[in-house]
Every structure is written in structure tokens, then in C-alpha cells.
């Protein structure tokens, strides 16, 4: 069975799907990521945030976007405060309809 077939099966049975998030920061310092997360909350409370440890880096990702266009729109809105923000594809939580 192919990887994509397995991925489709997992996403069908769960509340997950292939989508996009915005990577705000990836740093070796957890303290720096926490500081950026606090700054992010002040401006964008309505987006879900995900702090992920991907050795040796801690990453701050935001959003559960179904399309690249939607994620790009939000990334553009963040550029003035978070210049390094960019869109990444990954498994995201499906939004409730």
C-alpha cells in the first residue's frame, strides 16, 4: 500500500487532513520561542498555535488551513511583525463545519 493511500485512510478516519500551517520561528532556544509565542498571542489570538520540538529545534507553527491561498493570506498579514513566517504543508486539524 502506498504512503498516500495510507495517509488518505488515516485522514478519513480521524479529524485530520493534509493542509497548511505557518512556521513563525524555529530556534534551539525554547525561551526565545516562548517569547515569540507571547508576542504572537497579542496580535493573533484567533489562530491556533502549536509548539513542536523537532530535535534540536523548537518550532512555533500556527493555523489549520485547508488551502495554500488561505495560509498565504495570513502569512502576509503577519509579515510586518514576524518577517520569517512562511507556509508549510503538513497534517492539520479539520475545522468544524
Description of each model-found segment:
Residues 1-97:
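Acidic/polar low-complexity segments and flexible, solvent-exposed patches
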Amino acid at each position: 500500500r502506498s504512503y498516500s493511500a495510507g495517509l488518505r485512510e488515516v485522514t478519513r478516519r480521524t479529524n485530520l487532513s493534509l493542509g497548511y500551517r505557518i512556521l513563525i520561528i524555529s530556534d534551539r532556544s525554547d525561551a526565545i520561542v516562548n517569547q515569540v509565542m507571547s508576542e504572537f498571542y497579542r496580535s493573533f489570538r484567533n489562530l491556533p498555535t502549536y509548539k513542536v520540538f523537532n530535535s534540536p529545534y523548537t518550532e512555533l507553527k500556527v493555523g489549520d488551513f485547508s488551502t495554500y491561498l488561505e495560509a498565504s493570506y495570513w502569512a502576509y498579514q503577519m509579515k510586518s511583525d514576524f518577517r520569517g513566517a512562511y507556509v508549510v504543508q503538513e497534517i492539520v486539524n479539520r475545522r468544524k463545519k
